[in-house]
Every structure is written in C-alpha cells, then in structure tokens.
C-alpha cells in the first residue's frame, strides 16, 4: 500500500503481508485481524481494486474461490501446495 492509503488499507496490507505461501484465510479473518471485524466485504472490494497483494490466498467463509477467477486462483493455490476441489479449498 502506498503511504497515502487509508488506515483500513494499511491494516489489510499488513495482514496480507504476513501470509506465507500455502496459507489461506477468509475475508472475515483478514477483516478481524486488521481490526475491522465485520468488514469482510470491504476486504473483498479492496482486493478486487488493488494490485500486488496475494488475493488468491483469501477465500469465502465456506472456502469458496473468487467467482470468475476460480481457475487462476486454483492454479496459484495449487502451486503453493493448497488442495482445491469443486471450487473450494480442501482442508487437510
């Protein structure tokens, strides 16, 4: 995030910056960790509109991948060792 980012953007960027390859979190977990519980939709909008963040490591609360980007997200997650089946992250 650039220095002129909002406090919310900065907090989300910090959370995303701590994610390691193969680590998957939900939009809600990112929002809560950033100090904004309940702001899961705002996290989604921010990821949609921002470049350079590991968006593929963030999924819905049910493990579903980003609509319209499922193939790319599954490929990126698979390259990091994350199992995906039927458009969802598979635990284990």
Q: Which residues make up each language-model segment?
A:
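Nucleic acid-binding interface residues in structured DNA/RNA-binding domains
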Residues: 1-92
């Amino acid at each position: 995030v650039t220095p002129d980012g909002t406090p919310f953007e900065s907090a989300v960027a910090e959370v995303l910056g701590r994610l390691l390859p193969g680590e998957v979190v939900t939009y809600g977990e990112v929002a809560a960790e950033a100090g904004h519980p309940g702001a899961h939709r705002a996290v989604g909008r921010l990821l949609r509109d921002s470049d350079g963040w590991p968006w593929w490591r963030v999924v819905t609360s049910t493990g579903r991948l980003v609509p319209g980007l499922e193939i790319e997200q599954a490929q990126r997650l698979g390259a990091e060792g994350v199992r995906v089946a039927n458009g969802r992250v598979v635990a284990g």
